[in-house]
A protein has these predicted regions:
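The feature marks helicase ATPase cores and/or their adjacent C-terminal helical subdomains
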Residues: 1-371
């Protein structure tokens, strides 16, 4: 069985690679985390092949789990929980009741509406709709002796598809990640493509396995070791060059953030520090997108949060640094003192531009806004 993880860098063309590596005459299943990812994949497939290959299916991971791992085995699921006549009514994106809620004084208390994982109500609401948030957890939970939903479903998937490809794998956490690993042990050919350093960037789904454990953050080398333990080969070469960022930008990111990324020869761009004499021109230039750590809507100019810029490409960007990062250009500055999640968000922000990246210190911006 062929199982591979392709580790990429920002702007390397992950989706481009996925869509161009497939054999359109083979039966391919391409999965991604968000509908935006799916939209990008469909557009890339059109560019690569002129149309969506007839034998290629594209869907979100949640849709895949529901359609291939739950619906065909609903009678088995119903019997497992004592509901042999179960007929469900789709899925809901509303989250199930949490185990603990805040009391009158703000203290955590038990939620009377919470159901444990051995109860069917943990996975389905009163309208017989499956909770989207617990789909993978449900599939992992259903076992009878050595038999499991995963084994049965994987056998069917191997019949339907020659290759399974998962784009932006760094977006998957906890039960979704566990399900992917469990399926990989049964599915004949699976390829995962993603950027380790773009994990924990989104506002949601940013904790837990495989990037966090009881000891805290799982580093790059430890992550690679864990993936190899699961039977995957790792390709750290194919997508190590950014098609977006210049050599100068990538060199600075590598040197200051400790993230290995190679630039291209086509685009030209530099890191440019903005001081009190030049800040007005940069802030007032609407063609230069401003990227801020958070609360973009509170700034008196059009801005975008670092994390929300993930996946975007701009001609030029202006990254406004936090106080913690003001001295990043100093030789004595150590990125190791900064939280990994913050480093990842800064990495995303600094790799959005095809041209120049302007850097503004928080103190310089504060003075400008107080004028």
């Amino acid at each position: 069985m062929a199982k591979q993880v392709i580790l990429a860098v920002a702007g390397a063309g992950k989706t481009y690679h996925v869509c161009h590596m497939i054999d359109k005459d083979k039966k391919n299943l391409i999965l991604a985390f968000t509908h935006e990812n799916i939209h990008n994949i469909l557009n890339e497939l059109m560019d690569a092949h002129g149309s969506i290959p007839e034998l290629t299916s594209v869907m979100t991971f949640d849709s895949f789990v529901y359609r291939y791992l739950i619906l065909p085995y609903e009678s088995t699921i119903g019997e497992f929980f004592g509901y042999p006549e179960l007929i469900s009514s789709g899925i809901t994106t509303v989250d199930p009741p949490k185990q603990r809620i805040k009391g009158r004084n703000g203290e955590p208390i038990a939620n009377p509406y919470y159901h444990s994982k051995n109860e069917f109500e943990h996975y389905i609401n009163r309208k017989k709709q499956y909770y989207c948030a617990t789909l993978s957890e449900l599939v992992l939970y259903i076992k009878k002796g050595r038999d499991s939903l995963i084994k049965r479903a994987a056998a069917a998937i191997n019949m339907f598809y020659d290759h399974v490809l998962i784009d932006e794998f760094q977006d998957f956490r906890e039960y979704d990640y566990e399900l992917i690993i469990s399926m990989a042990k049964q599915i004949n050919n699976m390829v995962l493509v993603g950027d380790y350093y773009q994990h924990s960037v989104s506002a949601t789904n940013n904790s837990g396995k495989p990037f966090q454990n009881k000891e805290g953050e799982v580093g790059y080398d430890a992550f690679c070791h864990e993936i190899e333990k699961q039977g995957f080969s790792i390709d750290q070469c194919t997508l190590m060059g950014s098609r977006r960022c210049s050599k100068n930008i990538c060199s600075y990111v590598s040197r200051k953030l400790g993230i290995s990324i190679e630039g291209n020869n086509k685009n030209e761009g530099d890191i440019i520090w903005v001081d009190e004499t030049s800040i007005a021109a940069i802030i007032q230039n609407s063609n230069i997108i401003k990227l801020v750590y958070n609360n973009a809507n509170k700034y008196p100019f059009r801005a975008l949060n670092w994390s929300y810029s993930k996946g975007d490409t701009f001609s030029q960007t202006c990254v406004i640094l936090t106080e913690q990062l003001e001295k990043i250009d100093d030789p004595a500055f150590s990125i190791k003192k900064i939280k990994p999640t913050t480093v990842n968000k800064l990495y995303v922000a600094m790799t959005r531009s095809k041209g120049n990246v302007y850097l503004i210190k928080a103190s310089v911006l504060k003075k400008y806004l107080e004028q």
